[in-house]
C-alpha cells in the first residue's frame, strides 16, 4: 500500500479577536485554501515498523503528525475498533516533503495533520464522520479542522476550531503568498502582545462578507487584529511590512503575507 497526497496552506482573509476566555482568545476568521506553488507532499506506506520522516523543526513528540496519530489511536480504541486496525498505525512509514513553513500563519503543521487524518479515514475506509474527525483535530491544534474539512473557504469561530463551509467563488487559484525567509512569529508571543482597542461586536456581519469584498474594502490592519502585535514583537517583520504595498495582507499571527495575483496582461 502506497498513498501520496498533496496538502496546501491556508490564509486568513480576516481575523478578528472577540475576547479572551481562559488562557486563549475567542475569534472569528475566514480561512481560504491557497493552491499555488507552496505545498507539502505526504506519502503513506505500509512497512514493518513505524517511521516519520521530513524536514521538521521540532522533536518527534511535538510534531503535529505524531500528535494526530496518538490522538487517532486513542479515539479508535474508545470506539472499540479491532486491535489489528489500531496496530496497523504502528506499521506506517510516513514521509513529508515539507515546503510550507511553520510559524508563518499558513497552518504549517496543522496542514499535514489535518490532511493525514482526512486521508487515513479514506484509505482505511473507517467511515468516521466529519464531526468525529473534528473532535480529534481540535485536540491537535486550532487550525487542523480547516484542513480536515477539505473546504476551500470557511468561517472559523470559537478558538478557530469550529469550522463552517462558506459558499463563495473560491479564491484558491487567485491568491499568492509571500513567506519571508527566516522570519518566524511565535503565536504565543503575538497573542500576549495583543491589546484590545475596542469591544468587537460585529461578528455576525463579518461572517457574511464575501472574501473578495473584504480584500477590496479593508487594508491589512483593518482585516487582521494580530498584525499590530506581530509588528511590535518582531523587528524583522516590521522592516519587511514597511516595504510592502497596500495590496498585501497578513495571515494568522504571521509571518506570511498574501495578495490577489496581479491581473495578467492581455486578459490571460
Swiss-Prot record:
* Active site as annotated: 10, 143
Enzyme Commission no: 2.7.1.148
Query: What are this entry's molecular-function GO terms?
Result: 4-(cytidine 5'-diphospho)-2-C-methyl-D-erythritol kinase activity; ATP binding
Question: What is catalysed by this protein?
Answer: 4-CDP-2-C-methyl-D-erythritol + ATP = 4-CDP-2-C-methyl-D-erythritol 2-phosphate + ADP + H(+)
Locate the transmembrane regions by residue number.
Answer: none
Residue runs in coiled coils: none
The protein's matches in InterPro entries, at most eight in alphabetical order, are given as:
GHMP_kinase_C_sf (IPR036554), GHMP_kinase_N_dom (IPR006204), IspE (IPR004424), Ribosomal_Su5_D2-typ_SF (IPR020568), Ribsml_uS5_D2-typ_fold_subgr (IPR014721)
Q: Which residues bind ATP?
A: 101-111
Q: Which processes are annotated in GO (biological process)? A: isopentenyl diphosphate biosynthetic process, methylerythritol 4-phosphate pathway; terpenoid biosynthetic process
Give the top-level enzyme category: transferase
Q: Which UniProt keywords apply?
A: ATP-binding, Isoprene biosynthesis, Kinase, Nucleotide-binding, Transferase
Q: Does the keyword Thylakoid apply?
A: no
Respond yes or no to whether keyword ATP-binding is given for this record: yes
Pathway it belongs to? Answer: Isoprenoid biosynthesis; isopentenyl diphosphate biosynthesis via DXP pathway; isopentenyl diphosphate from 1-deoxy-D-xylulose 5-phosphate: step 3/6
Q: Which family does it belong to?
A: Belongs to the GHMP kinase family. IspE subfamily.
**Which HAMAP family did the record assign?**
IspE
Role of this protein: Catalyzes the phosphorylation of the position 2 hydroxy group of 4-diphosphocytidyl-2C-methyl-D-erythritol.
NCBIfam families in the cross-refs: ispE (TIGR00154), PRK04181.1 (NF003216)
What name is this protein filed under?
4-diphosphocytidyl-2-C-methyl-D-erythritol kinase
Gene responsible for this protein: ispE
